[in-house]
Amino acid sequence: MTLSFTARWRDELPATYTALLPTLLKNARLIWYNDKLAQQLAIPASLFDVTNGAGVWGGETLLPGMSPVAQVYSGHQFGVWAGQLGDGRGILLGEQLLADGSTLDWHLKGAGLTPYSRMGDGRAVLRSTIRESLASEAMHYLGIPTTRALSIVASDTPVQRETQETGAMLMRLAQSHMRFGHFEHFYYRREPEKVQQLADFAIRHYWPQWQDVPEKYVLWFEEVAARTGRLIVEWQTVGFSHGVMNTDNMSILGLTIDYGPFGFLDDYDPGFIGNHSDHQGRYRFDNQPSVALWNLQRLAQTLTPFIEIDALNRALDRYQDALLTHYGQRMRQKLGFFTEQKDDNVLLNELFSLMAREGSDYSRTFRMLSHTEQQSASSPLRDTFIDRAAFDAWFDRYRARLRTEAVDDALRQQQMQRVNPAVVLRNWLAQRAIDAAEQGDMAELHWLHEVLRQPFTDRDDDYASRPPEWGKRLEVSCSS
């Protein structure tokens, strides 16, 4: 089957990009590709059979229909207007036409200098490329909207970060790379007609059912707000900290995008800061819902030339509604509740308080709770707490709450184990794969990808265990 590509972004939004080709890496070689995703997209296996160079995966060749561009956008970074940003090292190669008529961006990250590189070198390093591939695939298999990773190319090109590393490229796929920052760019350039063109493009291609509706812009922004709310809930309930929620890292489609200093909670710490460059804690774990609303308000501001302010404020309420409604639903599922009762939040917050005091492992606590039997007065989870009396008191109230519903253990446990993962991408697991890959051993990288495809399957190895002490102290920054 021949892959078919189009260039809708290039053809319809000429003010938003610069056309250019990737800059090649030295001794580029394909070290991993996503076989399952490739099969789903009917990508010929022959494209991955690269024995001399890295082919399209290293930007050495283009497939028919590809028209590479680097996109321009702006944004607020750490709450401050940063001006023009853009794809400083990534190139949108083209948009794959799928059988259902939709498209999928092929975006090559680490593809070299662009007009938007500012002080950067246009490169991505092997370390950050591996982290993004693992994170995006982990999130996908957790059921969380995200970009996807299709391939990784390593090289011998030296790249200077805190230390000297080697350059790499990631082929990232997404339904769209449209960001809040695209709208901010033209709003602050006082070009409202181009802001409206972006909105028209989004509606035409992603919400075509509203094209001819008079209130199409309001409906569209309401949906952007609601999707953002649901995404943040998924992050919070699985214990994911993005680390750098700048407006240019926010997706119009409600996707998790731009994996940098991310982290999954180990010990439950609501104030967890994954990014050691975030000195003020703006993007700490428990502040993500507030930051997302702030970012939506910045996006709303760009839409004021063609949407009434009252309508924008009502749309922003959709974010809060989606956040609260979806959070309640998801946390009840995590606790094994099938109905909503007035004291559920009290019970949940008591558990969180106990976990915070004890430094309980976030994922393991909920996973172990999912094995609870109503008739059993004890739980293996009890042994993980120092204050057994406090846990016993909470557990008695929890079991009493379970007994208010006529649901047997098997059905409840099944529900809980579908939303409480046994495996998440802990930073130390990613680092172990990176360390091996930097020595030329890709086995752990490949195996970890396999493990992350089954996050809801119980395991008795270290992929599902608490991290070693050194693994809790890993520092992650925006450097990539």
From Swiss-Prot:
A family per Pfam: SelO
Matches recorded under InterPro entries: adnlytase_SelO, SelO
Catalytic activity: L-seryl-[protein] + ATP = 3-O-(5'-adenylyl)-L-seryl-[protein] + diphosphate; L-threonyl-[protein] + ATP = 3-O-(5'-adenylyl)-L-threonyl-[protein] + diphosphate; L-tyrosyl-[protein] + ATP = O-(5'-adenylyl)-L-tyrosyl-[protein] + diphosphate; L-histidyl-[protein] + UTP = N(tele)-(5'-uridylyl)-L-histidyl-[protein] + diphosphate
Enzyme Commission number(s): 2.7.7.-, 2.7.7.108
Record-listed Mg(2+) binding positions: 249, 258
Highest taxon listed in the record's lineage: Bacteria
Obligatory cofactor(s): Mg(2+); Mn(2+)
Entry keyword set: ATP-binding, Magnesium, Manganese, Metal-binding, Nucleotide-binding, Nucleotidyltransferase, Transferase
Residues reported in the UniProt entry to bind ATP: 86, 88-89, 109, 121-122, 172, 179, 258
GO molecular function, one term: ATP binding
NCBIfam families: adnlytase_SelO, PRK00029.1
Protein name: Protein nucleotidyltransferase YdiU
Gene of this entry: ydiU
